[in-house]
């Protein structure tokens, strides 16, 4: 796994309701040099985003409990904080390109670290 340039300067918010999957994603991104914040649902992620200004990438699952899913969260983030890059993931659905905000990327589950890191690089390039 290659470490992206400026990884240490990028804080990632991981939003995943499956504890084991979230822990693995945290480990994967920390191993790649990213600083990571985690949330178990979109509502928790929204509260974190409102209280912090250092999030550079949102890495979110689509299906999760709470008042909004990952698509709704990503759309709200793209509207309110357009500088935050979006990487969306799911093992159950494959969104149409129009469902992913303009500067967002989709990575299907199960994913490998290199797939996620490439998506981060592409999202950051937009």
Give the residues covered by each predicted segment.
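Non-catalytic signal-transmission and effector/linker regions of two-component phosphorelay proteins
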Residues: 1-13, 19, 26, 44, ...
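Charged docking surfaces used in two-component/phosphorelay signaling
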Residues: 23-31
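Acidic, metal-coordinating helix/loop segments flanking the phosphotransfer/catalytic sites
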Residues: 38-57, 97
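Acidic catalytic/metal-coordinating carboxylates
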Residues: 41, 68-73
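Conserved phosphotransfer cores of two-component systems
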Residues: 50-53, 76-83, 95, 99
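Active-site residues of response regulator receiver
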Residues: 61-62
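Hydrophobic/aromatic residues positioned on beta-strands within the core alpha/beta folds
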Residues: 89-90
């Amino acid at each position: 796994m290659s470490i992206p340039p400026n990884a240490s300067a990028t804080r990632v918010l991981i939003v995943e309701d499956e504890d084991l999957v979230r822990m693995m994603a945290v480990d994967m991104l920390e191993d790649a040099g990213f600083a990571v914040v985690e949330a178990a649902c979109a509502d928790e992620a929204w509260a974190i985003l409102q209280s912090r200004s250092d999030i550079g990438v949102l890495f979110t699952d689509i299906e999760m409990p709470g008042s909004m899913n990952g698509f709704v969260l990503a759309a709200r983030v793209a509207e309110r904080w357009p500088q935050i890059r979006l990487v969306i993931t799911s093992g159950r659905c494959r969104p149409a390109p129009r469902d992913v905000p303009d500067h967002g990327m989709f990575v299907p589950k199960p994913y490998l670290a290199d797939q996620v890191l490439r998506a981060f690089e592409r999202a950051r390039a937009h």
